[in-house]
């Protein structure tokens, strides 16, 4: 059996080698020639999986070790009888930690009490729900918006988009969709951007294209935190220059998230092939507790991982893709013992 795997998939050799012969290729370089004789294709976000890639191939299973779905033509895969699995939720903890870290740093630098701020979360899936739990632990009031969930689940504490955009801190956590009753493409645009005020802290850590960048770059906010961009890696320089923190789509790039993404695909592939799982694979991420001896939450979080280094790395945007591919080691908070209480939820 032949497997073609994005070489950025975490521990691909240790996790997938016993299935057969592995060819590892950079995600952007995976093409129809490289997958023609493959049985299994495992990707991250940089490979467009569609008829152009797979027509004429013998691929029977596609696994994506990331949460996004806009790089996958699911209708095509279904029409060809190709099994598809996506590691939904694998990076929810990492992204929520990114947002909380930025809020804590901003509160210190701009001298405000985050417990007196409202946090508007748009999209209450894996990431949004995780972030809401962390915010509650920290005493931050949340405004939650997710029309599809509200429609089907009748959740009691959700509010409309206008109300959510009125929050002191607004963050997007929706998938990127262009069709359906509630498309998220350019969800924040010229028709509703006026709800964002010059005192608003605005995040996009979801997908590029959810906020209309040509409008965003002209609006004054208190702070912009931008991790996801239209047309990556050719990002909007004017918008980058407005940002308090501009990072190269790495909010979800913890070691834990990468491992969980690979492991979830591994589990799905075992099920697909009827193979027994190797229980030792779970030990690839285990490590002893690490100690942090800092007196404030800000200093503790920055000692665990300082996201300012990620922003500095792409001051030259030519580094965008290489930095993502060679991202520094970053562990999630539950691996650490600290003097300050970490909002682990």
UniProtKB/Swiss-Prot annotation:
Catalytic residues (positions): 207, 232, 249
Chief localisation class: cytoplasm
Pathway recorded for this protein: Cofactor biosynthesis; pyridoxine 5'-phosphate biosynthesis; pyridoxine 5'-phosphate from D-erythrose 4-phosphate: step 2/5
Pfam family, one: 2-Hacid_dh
Localization in the cell: Cytoplasm
Superkingdom of source: Bacteria
Keywords: Cytoplasm, NAD, Oxidoreductase, Pyridoxine biosynthesis
Summary of subunit composition and partner proteins: Homodimer.
Protein name: Erythronate-4-phosphate dehydrogenase
UniProt gene name: pdxB
